[in-house]
């Protein structure tokens, strides 16, 4: 499951909305929405994320958080190590091999380390 899919499911459950009802409201098939929730589809489009935000009447901060989760929800992320050091390339490969076997506490610790070492920059608003 992707971060976006997990949050989408939480939002839907909190409002007592069925998968079919939300799919109809978003004008997508229930199969597509289920695949999105389970991480079997790619990153949702900005338009779909916007529709979800409207369907759940999310406030600005929650809508931004959902959009951020969508950007972090590529089910098959790729990392091009061309131009990186041998150490960085080795780390990327080792991480790819190890990640599926890491316990949740270790994943959380790595996420904290990355967030501390490279804080996310706020997105600039267009328009």
Model-found features: residue ranges?
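Conserved hydrophobic/aromatic packing and binding residues within compact polymer-binding modules
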Residues: 8, 22-23, 33-36
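DNA major-groove recognition helix of helix-turn-helix/homeodomain DNA-binding modules
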Residues: 47-65, 71-72
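Recognition helix of helix-turn-helix/homeodomain-like DNA-binding domains
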Residues: 27-43, 51
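A short, Lys/Arg-rich alpha-helix, primarily the initiator
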Residues: 1-14, 109
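Interfacial/linker helices and their anchor residues that mediate assembly or domain coupling
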Residues: 71-127
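Alpha-helical residues within the helix-turn-helix
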Residues: 13, 24, 54
């Amino acid at each position: 499951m992707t971060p976006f899919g997990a949050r989408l499911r939480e939002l839907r459950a909190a409002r007592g909305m069925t998968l079919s009802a939300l799919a109809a409201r978003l004008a997508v098939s229930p199969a597509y929405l289920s695949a999105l929730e389970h991480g079997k589809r790619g990153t949702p489009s900005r338009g779909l994320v916007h529709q979800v935000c409207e369907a759940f009447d999310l406030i600005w901060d929650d809508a931004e958080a959902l959009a951020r989760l969508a950007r972090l929800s590529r089910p098959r992320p790729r990392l091009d190590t061309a131009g990186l050091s041998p150490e960085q390339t080795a780390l990327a490969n080792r991480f790819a091999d190890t990640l599926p076997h890491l316990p949740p506490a270790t994943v959380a610790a790595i996420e904290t380390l990355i967030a501390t070492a490279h804080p996310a920059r706020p997105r600039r608003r267009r328009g």
